[in-house]
Amino acid sequence: MRMRIRNQNNHLHFPVAEAGLSPTHFQADTFPPSFRKRITVQHDGIDTDLVAPKPDAALELDNGAKLTRDDEVVTFINRNLEPYRGYHIFMRALPELLKKRPNAQVVMLGGDETSYGARPPKGKTWKQIFIDEVRDKISDQDWTRVHYLGRVPYDRFLSMMQVSRVHIYLTYPFVLSWSLLEAMSAGAAIVASDTPPVKEAMVDGETGMFVDFFDQVSLVEKTCKLLDDAALRQKLGTAARQHIVDQYDLKRTCLPKHLEWVDQLAKQPVLGPDQFIS
């Protein structure tokens, strides 16, 4: 019943819709065939001129310290830190990652609310729930290398991506995060969950490395592999950026296609009420 109620908006609008737009095939393919055939897949686009590698980038932490590309920085981003985007998996892998990487600085970005999945018990946050779950497995000294930024202005987000040595992206089969594409555009080396929306944007071994969503051991192993191999990081990061420039560039690819879609739609004859597909 809950799902039917959530779908009512689409059911009310699609019978009178002549066309639809979806940023990904994964999202478009969630619609019934009668709706899907009218949906054009075209991503919003990434400003690859703005979101680009920056060798002299620096990220200032809340404690005043600055991280640069000379530091071993591991990054993780959610709009809000929650299980739907793999926060719990990342946190459960964190104790072992910190043990194996004594010089790593782990930087996490995201709010304390809930964007997509189930809400935490009243009075709690998913962020703190999973901190509490793993904190006794992490020494006080190692915990000083874990940095929560909360929500930040866009320029600070960009700096975080530009200093990242390895970026970790995890998600259930759901809407693809724009931050993954921005990380690729920034030339980051990425370890990402082997889930359908991710596979639409990345190729394992070519533009990033895949890991089973629930496999914390493999997540740590592949992150360490990238941290140990500068040449592999460079190869994957360069290919990831080129893919975004070729397929997702806002100004040269996506925006022109959006305008073309609008122009073609405007040229179609206006349908009468009895001509729409139910």
Describe the residue ranges of each PLM region.
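Short alpha-helical donor nucleotide-sugar binding micro-motif in glycosyltransferases
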Residues: 151, 159-164
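Aromatic "clamp/platform" in nucleotide-sugar-dependent glycosyltransferases that forms part
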Residues: 172
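Conserved acidic donor-binding segment of nucleotide-sugar-dependent glycosyltransferases
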Residues: 204-205, 209-216, 225-230
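Membrane-proximal helix-turn-helix segments that form the acceptor-binding/catalytic region
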Residues: 1-20, 33
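A charged, aromatic-enriched C-terminal amphipathic alpha-helix characteristic of glycosyltransferases
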Residues: 231-267
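Conserved donor-binding/catalytic core segment of Leloir-type glycosyltransferases
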Residues: 21, 63-85, 91-96, 106-109
